[in-house]
UniProtKB/Swiss-Prot annotation:
CDD domains per record: PT_UbiA_Cox10 (cd13957)
UniProt miscellaneous comment: Carbon 2 of the heme B porphyrin ring is defined according to the Fischer nomenclature.
Key words of the record: Cell inner membrane, Cell membrane, Heme biosynthesis, Membrane, Transferase, Transmembrane, Transmembrane helix
Organism: Xylella fastidiosa (strain 9a5c)
Name this polypeptide is given: Protoheme IX farnesyltransferase
Length: 301
């Protein structure tokens, strides 16, 4: 029984989903300008659960649709569906249950806009990216990155309903950060795993355009990212605490991207990939801490 539960747990890509729901949680905290009301706490808790269920469902559908590809790649050849621990119909039913629960919770317990945006993001990743973009273009990560960048807006929507223009603008800034972060994050991994992607006929950028070109694109997007991460300060959403942290995190990421250029180094690409995860977690954590510090200063004074 425990082994079977573990198989279903692995279908949800728990580490990936943890980062997704963390950014959604930060979106919730930043959306509340003061002490949250009982209604906001309830909406936030249900929103968190609904977003987690949807992300888990998307991960399961991704594994269902990518089973043949996963079987050809060393990184994914262990997955439960690939090795026969679960059957395709079981994955389909599992994902269907998660989606049903997610949409029910978000529609009835949170608000309609959160449910609609969450479902749209799920389809964007699990179907449009997985079935079409991933297999068709080397810009798959860039075009499909919007679906994966949406969680902060989903969290923001859960507690505010995105009822004002300011809500949309501020939530969009958080989405923009993840959207621009996604290419250097995934391309660093793709450099390290390019033989796997080539074997599976997936047109990732290092496969179609080479490692040197991909490294230059990683640096370009990292430069853009270092600018985008300053926008929350420029709009007044965040303050000097976040600014200082962002500048340090950006400087380190830029160093990784620059170091990756000459000579192209597969092992260093994996280190860059690892740092990109730490980077995003830390950046959003500092966004949240900065928000709390500014609230505390407001109430103390």
């Amino acid at each position: 029984m425990a082994a079977r539960l573990r198989d279903y747990w692995d279908l949800t890509k728990p580490k990936v989903v943890a980062l997704i729901v963390f950014t959604a949680l930060v979106g919730m905290f930043l959306a509340i300008p003061g002490i949250p009301s009982v209604v906001q706490i309830q909406s936030g808790a249900l929103g968190f659960l609904g977003i987690w269920l949807a992300a888990a469902a998307a991960a399961a559908i991704n594994q269902l649709l990518d089973a043949k590809i996963d079987a050809q790649m060393a990184r994914t050849s262990w997955r439960p569906l690939v090795v026969g621990k679960v059957r395709p119909v079981q994955v389909l039913v599992f994902a269907g249950v998660l989606i049903t629960l997610s949409m029910t919770i978000l529609t009835l317990g949170v608000n309609l806009i959160t449910a609609v945006l969450t479902f749209t993001s799920l389809i964007g990743y699990a179907v449009i990216y997985t079935v079409y973009l991933k297999r068709m273009t080397s810009q798959n990560i860039v075009i499909g990155g919007l679906a994966g960048a949406m969680p902060p807006m989903l969290g923001w929507a859960a507690v505010t309903g995105l009822s004002t223009a300011a809500d949309w603008i501020n939530a969009s800034l958080l989405v923009a950060i993840i959207f621009v972060w996604t290419p250097p994050h995934f391309w660093a991994l793709a450099i390290f795993r390019r033989a796997d992607y080539a074997k599976a006929s997936i047109p990732m950028l290092p496969v179609t355009h080479g490692v040197q070109h991909t490294s230059r694109q990683i640096l370009l997007y990292t430069v853009i990212l270092s600018v985008v991460t300053l926008l929350p300060v420029a709009t007044g959403m965040s303050g000097v605490f976040y600014l200082g942290a962002a500048l340090v995190l950006d400087a380190v990421f830029l160093w990784y991207a620059w170091r990756l250029l000459d000579p192209p180094d597969e092992l260093f690409a994996m280190k860059t990939f690892g740092y990109s995860i730490v980077y995003l977690m830390a950046l959003f954590a500092f966004l949240m801490f900065d928000h709390w510090l500014r609230l505390a200063d407001f109430y103390w004074n």
